[in-house]
């Protein structure tokens, strides 16, 4: 139960990303000139998916089945953003399926390009509780058939409060999620609070002392303590970038996240 199982074809990982697509995501993204939060989040997610596929390619045979993934968008409704296409209605998409399911190629003026799986959306309210309910259904089904795999990881990225429940309702749903486990350990929960305005990001804290409001503190308390391998990676990256080193008990939580903070959280959560 120490989160030490390594990913391979016999032990695939499970990643479930929850993306806030409410109206407030139309506001500008801190640290991403000219981009809305919705566009910046879509770009970061698409780049992450591309990197995950690339990590699964070791030879000319194409991506190996190293992970299963689901993307859940939430606003006035809950949307499954990836389709498996396997004909069996599986809620999670395997890495080989993901490699073949992008909708278009995005090209930048400087020549950079990447596949697009997710388009930006910013409309309606913030049905975060319902998104967590669906994440539970997906994760519960996955752990039932993958007990020898690494524990699943759920990453929730939002810029506001849930409109379909209280903080207690949110905590209750996260408690159900982290109650799921494999032989590797319990499910790992990340929360990323996207910045509404320029402020010092709080990266992987071990207490809520620097958090400005009860709701943000509540998101912190519903985030998992980082397993050792994730904490070691976060500390190495902090040293490399001249950032404060997270202490013992650091959680999978980022507050006042600019674009760089979102990317760091995604990278840590999908180790």
Language model: regions and residue ranges:
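Acidic, low-complexity intrinsically disordered regions
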Residues: 1-271
């Amino acid at each position: 139960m120490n989160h030490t199982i390594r990913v391979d074809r016999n032990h695939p990982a499970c990643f479930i990303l929850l993306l806030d697509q409410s109206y407030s995501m139309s506001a500008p993204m801190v640290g991403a000139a000219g981009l809305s939060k919705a566009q910046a989040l879509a770009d970061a997610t698409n780049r992450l998916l591309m990197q995950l596929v690339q990590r699964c390619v070791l030879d000319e045979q194409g991506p190996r089945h190293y992970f299963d993934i689901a993307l859940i968008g939430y606003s006035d409704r809950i949307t499954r953003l990836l389709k498996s296409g396997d004909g069996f209605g599986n809620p999670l998409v395997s890495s080989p399926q993901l490699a073949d399911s992008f909708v278009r190629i995005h090209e930048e003026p400087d020549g950079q390009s990447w596949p697009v799986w997710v388009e930006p959306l910013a409309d309606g309210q913030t049905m975060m509780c319902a998104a967590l309910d669906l994440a539970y259904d997906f994760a519960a089904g996955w752990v039932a058939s993958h007990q020898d795999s690494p524990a699943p990881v759920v990453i929730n990225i939002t810029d506001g409060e849930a409109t379909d429940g209280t903080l207690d309702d949110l905590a209750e749903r996260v408690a159900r999620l982290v109650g799921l486990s494999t032989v590797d350990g319990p499910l790992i929960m990340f929360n990323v609070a996207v910045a509404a305005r320029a402020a010092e990001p709080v990266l992987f804290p071990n207490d809520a002392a620097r958090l400005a409001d009860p709701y943000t503190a509540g998101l912190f308390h519903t985030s998992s303590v980082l397993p050792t391998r994730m904490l070691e990676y976060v500390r190495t990256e902090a040293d490399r970038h001249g950032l404060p080193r997270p202490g013992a008990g650091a959680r999978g939580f980022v507050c006042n996240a600019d674009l760089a903070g979102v990317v760091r959280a995604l990278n840590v959560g999908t180790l």
